[in-house]
């Protein structure tokens, strides 16, 4: 009996030591990453990422709702999905999946997220007004369009905050083709006008989904180390 109890106590001691060492290693790793990122409060920095990702997710929900609305009421049966178009952000070299994004440096990927959002400032500024004037959208739909515009601005600010806290440099004058589709949104030709709205949401959805993917991947690489 004495040997059995001694053996149990020995096992518990080893287990406690392992847990203690694991916690110590995690704290040390967090401190090292915090020092590397030049941030004083690593937990707060993680919260900043969480807030940015939440804004991105909300933004994508607004886009999904509005895109579905346009498809059902203005694009259905018109064959818009068979047309080939080029998005105004196509000049930005954007990875389209996690495997491609993994090949980009952290600072580059964060800067790309900023550039994509910045490229949509002008289109989203006009979108909600044109949905009212050209589509006769109802207040609930217009509210989502307005919230979409505001979410884009908030997410840009969140990314700037992340860059500032993490000592990243972001190029705020990214080289992308200026958006020039306003005339098509305002076209007196119904088919041209409807396709312009359809294509805007097609491009916006792709870019915004990519931004959310980039932010999640960046947080994973910076905060958790393994992805």
From Swiss-Prot:
GO cellular component, one term: extracellular space
Keywords attached to this entry: Disulfide bond, Glycoprotein, Hormone, Secreted, Signal
Annotated GO MF terms: hormone activity; prolactin receptor binding
Disulphide linkage map: 87-203, 220-227
Signal peptide positions on this chain: 1-31
Coiled-coil segments: none
Subcellular location: Secreted
InterPro entries noted in UniProt: 4_helix_cytokine-like_core, Somatotropin/Prolactin, Somatotropin_CS
Keyword Glycoprotein: yes
GO biological process: cell surface receptor signaling pathway; female pregnancy; mammary gland development; positive regulation of lactation; positive regulation of receptor signaling pathway via JAK-STAT; response to hypoxia; response to nutrient levels
Glycosylation sites: 41, 175
SUPFAM superfamilies: 4-helical cytokines (SSF47266)
PROSITE patterns reported in the protein's UniProt record: SOMATOTROPIN_1, SOMATOTROPIN_2
Family per similarity comment: Belongs to the somatotropin/prolactin family.
Name of this protein: Prolactin-4A1
Organism encoding this protein: Rattus norvegicus (Rat)
